[in-house]
Amino acid sequence: MDTTILRNRFRRQFGTSGDLYFSPGRINLIGEHTDYNGGFVFPGAVDKGITVEIFRNGTRQVKLLAIDVEDTPYLEFSLDDSQKPERHWACYIYGVCKELEKRGVNVGGFNAAFTGDVPRGAGMSSSAALESAFAFALNTMFADGRVDKFELAKIGQATEHNYCGVKCGIMDQFASVFGREGCLIRLDCRSLEYEYFPFDPQGYRLVLINSMVKHSLGNEYNERRASCEKAVALMDRQFGGVQTLRDANYEMLEAVKDGLTDDDYRRARYILDEKERVLAVCKALEEGDYELVGKKMYETHWGLSRDYTVSCPELDFLVETAQKCGVTGSRVMGGGFGGCTINLVRDTVCDKFTSKAQREYAKKYGIVPEIYQVVIGNGSRKLQ
C-alpha cells in the first residue's frame, strides 16, 4: 500500500512525522459458523489492511486523523476520559487504549493518522485490522512489545465487546495479529491452539466477489445458535460429555433426531459436516490438492444455503456462476445473508469468470459487484 498520502496528511496535520504500522484484514477459507460451536476455523491474513502513522506527543491527549472518513475525520480525546468518544470509529482506538491500560501498560498521549484498503462491508474485518494496528503500535511504543500476540488479539476482541457493542469471536483479530505469508491458520476455537498450513496455490488466485447486498439478520443468527444448542442439550442428556457440537458425532445426532425439528436437525448436521470438511482441507493443502480444497468449498456453500439456510439468492447466483465457469471452489464467506463469496480460481479462467460474474449479476440484480483479488500475507507489524 502506498503510504505517500498518509505521510503527507500526517505532516500537514501534526507538523512532524511518526512511525508506520500495518495490520491486515482476513479471509476465512472454510469453517463457517463453527466458532460458537467449539469447532475449527481456517483464516489467513491478506495483503489489504490498515496502515497507521503514530507519534508520541508527551501529553494525555490522543489526536486522531481518519483519512478515509468524510464526516468528522479529526477527533481528540483524553486518556483520562471515562466516556468513550461519540464517533464510532474512534471507539475502537479508545477501547484499545483502555484494554492495554487494564493489562498494566502506561499508555501516553499520541498523534495518529490511519488509512486502509480493506473494503468496508466486504467481510474482511476492517475493524479487527484497525484494533490490531493500534494495539500492536501502542504495545511497541509504550510497553516495548511485552504484551504477547495472544493478548493483543484478545485486546481487539475485548474492544469490540466492551466499547463497540459487538459480541464477536476471536478469529478476526487472531488472523490479523498471527497472519503469516503463504500460510493459513487452523484455529481451534475452544482451546485457541493453532497450526499453520501452507497455502501457496501456484496457478490459482483467491478472488472475492462482493454481492453489494446485506439482508437484515433480524433474529436469524440467534435462531441458528439455538438450534445447535437444542441438539447439544439432547445429546448431552442421552450420552453425557457433549458441551458443544464439537463433542458430537453423526450417530449421536441420529439418536436424538426425533426430538428435533427438521430445521434444528439439518443445522446441527451442517456443523458436523463442516468439522470434517475443515480437517479434509487441511490434509488436502498438505498434499497440494487444491482441486479437493475447491470441492469442499462448494460443499460448504450448499450446506450453508440448504441446511444452515444463511445464504441468499444473490450469493447462490454468484456461486452457480462460478460453477458454470469452471471455478475450482466458491462459497459465501462470513455470517451470510449478503457480503462476499470467496473463490479459488485457476489463472486460466479468472478473467472469463470475473467479467461474466459482473455482467450476469448486474443484468439480474441491477448492481455491479465489486471484485477483489487477495494474497495471503503477514500479520501486524512495524513498517520500515
Language model features: what each stretch is:
Residues M1-Y21, I27-I30, Y36-F40, F77-L79, ...:
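Gly/Ser-rich oxyanion-binding loop with an adjacent helix/lid
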Residues M1-R26, T51-E86, C183-G329, L344-Q384:
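C-terminal nucleotide
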Residues A129, C340-L344:
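FabD-like malonyl-/acyl-CoA
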Residues P43-A45, E53-R56, R87, G104:
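Short, charge-rich binding segments
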Residues G38-A45, R224-R225:
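Short Gly/aromatic-enriched secondary-structure transition segments
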Residues F337:
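Glycine-rich phosphate-binding loop
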